[in-house]
């Protein structure tokens, strides 16, 4: 049975649309959330806010006729009263403060920041010092590997964009025991400039970025411990900024367990993603960013060198959709009992 043939539909959600709000609706990921949720058949977008209580009210011209409401200042009491599910597209320090308040008000949370991704206290203190503790009921929301947990979660912590592209490729092999303990995993990733956020900087300035490719965050990127946490092994991760508006291409190198064949790798990937509607396994046909841009798909290809026991994998996603807003809506669908494809195809 092929990957596509094996997909099954989820139970239908409740008849009434779920009230949703977005905090941080003016950033790149936030605006994608507005676009997706304003047209979602099982969601009623009741409020979209800025990232601060002092944010000036504003419209979103790019979303005219899709969402003609106003993005208002962040008022936690009003958000808690207006929504049953709240999407947080805020900086991690703001999410760390806001989420407990909204949880106490009875809302379920889907958080796009890194505030609640790391389980280890020491790692969290190093990379996300604003997060003092993980709220009860938090689930790491890599959709393809946590569907049951997400359905019952009070807080879904969506993975980062780079970890999403990396783990959808590597986790099937790790779970099948096909990676060596000392797998020497290397992730070499290229991202469009929207991954750096909307705040202007020299690094994302047109004159600096256009016609160039630059590495950054060597041995110092907060997505490294997130990838390593899921794989339970050391990871070397190097991101690069490329002159594209959106998209991530990750080239991944690893050592396979002794005796692992190319056929075993293919079987592990097919088995792991048989029920993954947004993962497209391309095998020898290597993915490209242009094939996934403006979609919620993750394309994964690979080559195995059985003689050396090494594998090279290539994965591609749209960083703002599968790496952020699209994955968040996919998790929302699971949260409300809808088919996870709803509003994304």
Please provide the spans of the model-predicted regions.
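N-terminal Rossmann-like NAD(P) cofactor-binding subdomain of oxidoreductases
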Residues: 2-209, 214-216, 303-307, 342-344
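Alpha-helical scaffold segments in soluble metabolic enzymes
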Residues: 32, 36, 168-172, 226-230, ...
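Generic secondary-structure signature for well-ordered alpha-helical cores
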Residues: 38-42, 175-179, 221, 229-233, ...
């Amino acid at each position: 049975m092929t990957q596509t043939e094996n997909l099954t539909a989820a139970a239908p959600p409740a008849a009434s649309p779920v009230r949703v709000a977005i905090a941080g609706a003016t950033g790149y990921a936030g605006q994608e959330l507005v676009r997706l949720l304003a047209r979602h058949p099982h969601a009623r977008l009741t409020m979209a806010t800025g990232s601060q209580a002092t944010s000036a009210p504003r419209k979103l011209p790019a979303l005219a006729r899709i969402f003609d409401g106003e993005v208002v200042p962040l008022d936690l009491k009003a958000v808690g009263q207006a929504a049953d599910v709240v999407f947080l597209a805020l900086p991690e320090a703001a999410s760390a403060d806001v989420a407990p308040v909204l949880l106490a008000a009875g809302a379920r949370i889907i958080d796009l920041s890194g505030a609640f991704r790391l389980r280890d206290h020491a790692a969290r203190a190093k990379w996300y010092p604003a997060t003092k503790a993980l709220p009860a009921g938090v689930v790491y929301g890599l959709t393809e590997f946590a569907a049951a947990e997400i359905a019952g979660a009070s807080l879904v912590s969506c993975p980062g964009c780079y970890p999403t592209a990396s783990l959808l490729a590597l986790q099937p092999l790790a779970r099948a025991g096909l990676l060596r303990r000392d797998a020497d995993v290397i992730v070499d990733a290229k991202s469009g400039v929207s991954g750096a956020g909307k705040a202007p900087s020299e690094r994302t300035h047109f004159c600096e970025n256009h016609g160039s490719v630059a590495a950054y965050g060597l041995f110092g990127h907060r997505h490294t411990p997130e990838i390593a946490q899921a794989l339970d092994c050391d990871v070397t991760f190097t991101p690069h900024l490329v002159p594209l508006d959106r998209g991530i291409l990750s080239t991944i190198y690893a050592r396979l367990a002794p005796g692992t064949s190319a056929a075993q790798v293919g079987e592990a990937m097919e088995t792991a993603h048989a029920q993954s509607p947004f993962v497209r396994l391309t095998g020898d046909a290597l993915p490209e960013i242009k094939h996934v841009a403006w979609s919620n798909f993750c394309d994964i290809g690979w080559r195995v060198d059985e003689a050396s026991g090494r594998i090279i994998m290539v994965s591609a996603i749209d960083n703002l959709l599968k790496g952020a807003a699209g994955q968040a809506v996919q998790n929302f669908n699971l949260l409300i009992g809808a088919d996870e494809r709803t509003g994304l195809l």
